[in-house]
Amino acid sequence: MDVQQLEEAWAVRAGARDARLVEAPHVPAALSLLGIVRPGDRLVAFADDFADAFAHGFDACDVAMVGSPSVDAFVAASKGFDTSFEVEGPHLWWFVNSIGGFGLRVPDLRALGCAARETHALLVVDNTVADVFGCDPLRLGAALSLEALDRVCASKAPRKLVAASVARSQLKRHRVDAAAECAHALFADCGALALDLSAEEAYVLECGLSSFNARMQAHFDRARALAEYLAANEMVRNVRYPGLSSHPDHAVATGILEHGFGPAVEFDLMDCTAGEFFSMLPDEFRTSPAGGPTTRLSAPRGKQGSTIRLFAGTDNPLVVASTLDNALRK
């Protein structure tokens, strides 16, 4: 497949009107590179674990970070901004992750989508953690969905790629979704150059798409197993996983997420820092490429903090749990 065919294939998978591949290290960078968030726009974002990307990537815009993914928080941060769905703008953007932020929050995308349209805001969803297998943001009300493709490519792509998808504007009974129509017009006119993919990159992405569903289900199933192990482990605390009834967004997640509750689990250490914990583990837990078959750990609050974020691979969860257990007992 060439780039156009891959973009068309992604659009079909995402239920999108149009899709574009972008070279970018992460979704906020891709959103900035697309150029659809323009000077004079306001960007309201919940991404407390990615605040620096918004502080430096949208210099000409009015960026407001909110502390909660709730409708009330976004509406409050949008007051006083005169906006519409006219292409000329200025535009109001709402940004959330389908799973993200500290604690792996799951916003009510249906409620946010409805409120965004009432406020004349364009809802953008970073769908990287849940991915298109685990969440359908465009169906739930997003005007734009972006997803880093590390896991889609099984960590084999030589560059960091992001897929951007815009919602269809045709609703039931021949009604037009003004938000989606505005987003598509901005998307079509952004002037971003078509991505120049090598034959190797195209092959990796094509192969990744063909095996996507089975691999994603494996990631999700292993995350659930590891979350249940950690929740029962007395050597850690505050296990955050949307599939656990203790998670603050569990009820919302059951209606937003599909095929499980994503590949990520967070927990807090009790007796050591993240950096000390990493030193007790095999290097592959930290050095394996993102999105690959090996379970990977990070420290979202820094190595001096106590929070660990785990992304389940497709490796044996019993072996992973045993390795974690041995490190926790040292």
Predicted regions and their residues:
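Short intrinsically disordered coil segments
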Residues: D177-E181, P282, A327
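N-terminal entrance/gating region of PLP-dependent enzymes' catalytic architecture
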Residues: M1-Q5, V12
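Conserved PLP-enzyme active-site core in the AAT-like
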Residues: A9-M235
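Generic surface-pattern signal
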Residues: K79-T83, G191, S279-R286, R329
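Conserved C-terminal alpha-helix-loop-beta "cap" of PLP-dependent enzymes
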Residues: A231, M235-N326
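A structural alpha-helix within SAM-dependent methyltransferase catalytic domains
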Residues: G113, D325-L328
